Amino acid sequence: MMDSPKIGNGLPVIGPGTDIGISSLHMVGYLGKNFDSAKVPSDEYCPACREKGKLKALKTYRISFQESIFLCEDLQCIYPLGSKSLNNLISPDLEECHTPHKPQKRKSLESSYKDSLLLANSKKTRNYIAIDGGKVLNSKHNGEVYDETSSNLPDSSGQQNPIRTADSLERNEILEADTVDMATTKDPATVDVSGTGRPSPQNEGCTSKLEMPLESKCTSFPQALCVQWKNAYALCWLDCILSALVHSEELKNTVTGLCSKEESIFWRLLTKYNQANTLLYTSQLSGVKDGDCKKLTSEIFAEIETCLNEVRDEIFISLQPQLRCTLGDMESPVFAFPLLLKLETHIEKLFLYSFSWDFECSQCGHQYQNRHMKSLVTFTNVIPEWHPLNAAHFGPCNNCNSKSQIRKMVLEKVSPIFMLHFVEGLPQNDLQHYAFHFEGCLYQITSVIQYRANNHFITWILDADGSWLECDDLKGPCSERHKKFEVPASEIHIVIWERKISQVTDKEAACLPLKKTNDQHALSNEKPVSLTSCSVGDAASAETASVTHPKDISVAPRTLSQDTAVTHGDHLLSGPKGLVDNILPLTLEETIQKTASVSQLNSEAFLLENKPVAENTGILKTNTLLSQESLMASSVSAPCNEKLIQDQFVDISFPSQVVNTNMQSVQLNTEDTVNTKSVNNTDATGLIQGVKSVEIEKDAQLKQFLTPKTEQLKPERVTSQVSNLKKKETTADSQTTTSKSLQNQSLKENQKKPFVGSWVKGLISRGASFMPLCVSAHNRNTITDLQPSVKGVNNFGGFKTKGINQKASHVSKKARKSASKPPPISKPPAGPPSSNGTAAHPHAHAASEVLEKSGSTSCGAQLNHSSYGNGISSANHEDLVEGQIHKLRLKLRKKLKAEKKKLAALMSSPQSRTVRSENLEQVPQDGSPNDCESIEDLLNELPYPIDIASESACTTVPGVSLYSSQTHEEILAELLSPTPVSTELSENGEGDFRYLGMGDSHIPPPVPSEFNDVSQNTHLRQDHNYCSPTKKNPCEVQPDSLTNNACVRTLNLESPMKTDIFDEFFSSSALNALANDTLDLPHFDEYLFENY
């Protein structure tokens, strides 16, 4: 240390110092001009002058050898006179008296040093400076070393006197050590010299412990020093913003990860601030070692100030166009802070949060809800119980001007850094009260900008050790440290919260701010967080899974509910073990959350790894079966509903690479983990064309769902199934087949059929034994028709090639599919050889359905593959059959017209008009056998593919019961509908009825009392035998629509019903009654029974 200039008698030289940077002082009155340049406090500028925009230094003037005072160097300023009492202004100089020390004897020095040691130890329990001073002086002589934490000072009698071993030291060094010991009563135990906020090691060497008090003596710095900006041109509004930014951990992490750091003004801000801090710490150590404290307090601080001012000026220039600020004019950080963040979008995102203002007037009822996204929101007149999760304040109503109405801010998405502005301050200054949890994250106040009444802003920073840094640019180049937050509640101006995630990893932390408020409850309500609400969108998050699922599989998040997911485990955020080790890596899509019921189809979501969810196998199976039941209930639905499901699946399904054979089973073992393995992976390239066999996939899917209580859950890929629902005819067939496999849910399904004409399908399901095959097939064909028919024989679609390629391809495709199925398990007796091929296929179709429901997965894959191959071959074979079909139909039409003329002659006889009922019963015997044989010969000429195609399009529903106890009257009552065809019956149509009955002239009418299962089966078989050409497609064989309806009615004459029943139901009164019954026919289609 360099002493002040002295004269011969030892007194300091009168007058100002000669140090560089010290201005010359004028006379200061009776106090004298004894100036000590080394005694410059940390707040070396006059606060009174600084408020006026001036920078004047405070100098120390010594009144006597024992007392001194600080005065402003400005002659016009009287600070501190008038601000405090004179007794407080004049401070006794106990620590550092510059009384000249004359040479003393060694004995007197020993006694004075011992006294100083005892005095220092009595003031501080952890004072190691005195002992360390002995250690330093005794380091070369192996002096005794004591623990620094010991509060017991050894007795002087039992301790080697450190001064006695210092004979080689000069007297000025002894005096300096003595002075240091006197000055360490206020020094802390540790001093940060590394710039990282951590105390320096205490065992690095003996010299470091002597340097620490020297450093503190020369600089008067508090613990954990941090540089700060000095006030200039009334820029405290900008300095407080910069101080808050440089201490933000979230901002540091974000700026560090930037690609183009040099272009970021925030990166330059942090860089300059770190350079200033580094300059401070390195200069401290070098200055202490060199013994030049004056250089540390003057030149180094000038360099630090220059470094900080450079970046401040740059930011000020950047803000000037938007803020329109000028030097010397006071601005507000409320306006400057958001504008500064807008300079860089990626930085602004750290502060942007979305919320809504909810307001409802208690007087007039006026209410509104406005959504906003801002980085800083202003609150005024907050309620006494204000909290970030109860952020309400009083305000007037815009409608009735009623005051003291409450408006509340509801947070929707909170940014990592959350800022609010309070005009009147907060209700209380206990900042721990305002910490809150949101979406699994803790938000804690880390910075507060204080506003004083004299238009001055100060930033308070929460340090890691719980202390607070006061960054006041009026208080020198370094911030001050306080143990407590010492800001009145009314002066809290801007509050900054930062997100604290100490119990989760970085990867999960990235997904937490992406969650919605309604997906989970805040932790402040002490409710656990659902695993399904955490979206890990990147592919890297899936690497933590024990198995890798196919990339085209969407994972369903909603199979386990939130309550179930946390029932068997600990709180996910209760510790690092809860969420770090047992996190569930699910790959979720945004659209899956919108279609939770649909996403249950993808059962491969059970790639579970976490113990809380997978701990109980029973719960997992129960939830899986529940979702499967909901799937089965929705499978038997209308084409319009399936169209909706298809549209929803378009967004969440990937390109179908594995259609129906790539299945995975999730097996739960005792170690609460899941092993996923492939159950059946058949290599079939044709499976990519899933549209060829939608119904086969549906049956295979339902087969998987109907196997509960197994050790393995067998989810199946059904995304391609739903996305390929394009043809309503196939959809209706597969839906009806599904109803067979769900017998226990038949009542529920019958109540949930919403499509037009669903009552007809229910009618056929209950009364298939009575209705002929051609009628039921015709009904299904017309239901799936998309276009209304064109009336008239000339425009009849059966005699045209319009659309024949599409229809024939679809029919032939189904025929190959049915033919490729396994042999039937059981079927009724076969008919005559002329229709063996036709009769066998519906039973083969039904048998394949039974096999699929019993669990034959490979069979479903084989059928799917064969469907694809045969569908292409049938399209090529189409043109060859088309011409022959057309010729045979024309030939049959000519024969039917010839027979109609004979029937007209029979109708003209008086007997047939008189006894109508007898004629109806005898007409089947009046036809000659040659007529019947000629027609049957013609029918036998029809090729096999035509018969197969007609059977595939017109076969009865294989899933319904063939034997029903419903009466014929009930069936007819439901079947008859107010269509134009049924209300225009004529005598010609009745003649057609009688003529068509001639085909079964060799079959006697059944006895009415023999209406049992056997007779019904025989009737169906015989009816199928004769009517097979008609059943091929009634709309293509009959010349007009009246003949088709006549066919329906004539075939029913085989039953024991009387003709008066038909007269009753075909009367106009009965038809009108059915037409007016809106409950039975809510959405009836007038084209239901019409033909092309």
Swiss-Prot record:
Gene Ontology annotations for the cellular component aspect, listed alphabetically = Cajal body; extracellular space
Q: Per the UniProt record, which EC number(s) apply here?
A: 3.4.22.-
Question: Any one Gene Ontology biological process term?
Answer: Cajal body organization
List the active-site residues: 236, 456
The GO terms this record gives for MF are:
deSUMOylase activity; SUMO binding
Q: Which UniProt keywords apply?
A: Hydrolase, Nucleus, Phosphoprotein, Protease, Thiol protease
- Metal-binding is among the record's keywords: no
Boundaries of every USP domain copy: 227-500
| Subcellular compartments | Nucleus, Cajal body
Modified positions (Phosphoserine) are 909
- Stretches of Basic residues bias are at 810-819
List where Pro residues composition bias occurs.
Answer: 821-832
Which stretches of sequence are listed as region Disordered?
145-168, 185-207, 713-749, 797-859, 904-930
Q: What does this protein do?
A: SUMO-specific isopeptidase involved in protein desumoylation. Specifically binds SUMO proteins with a higher affinity for SUMO2 and SUMO3 which it cleaves more efficiently. Also able to process full-length SUMO proteins to their mature forms. Plays a key role in RNA polymerase-II-mediated snRNA transcription in the Cajal bodies. Is a component of complexes that can bind to U snRNA genes.
Q: How does it assemble?
A: Interacts with ELL.
Q: What is this protein called?
A: SUMO-specific isopeptidase USPL1
Its gene is USPL1
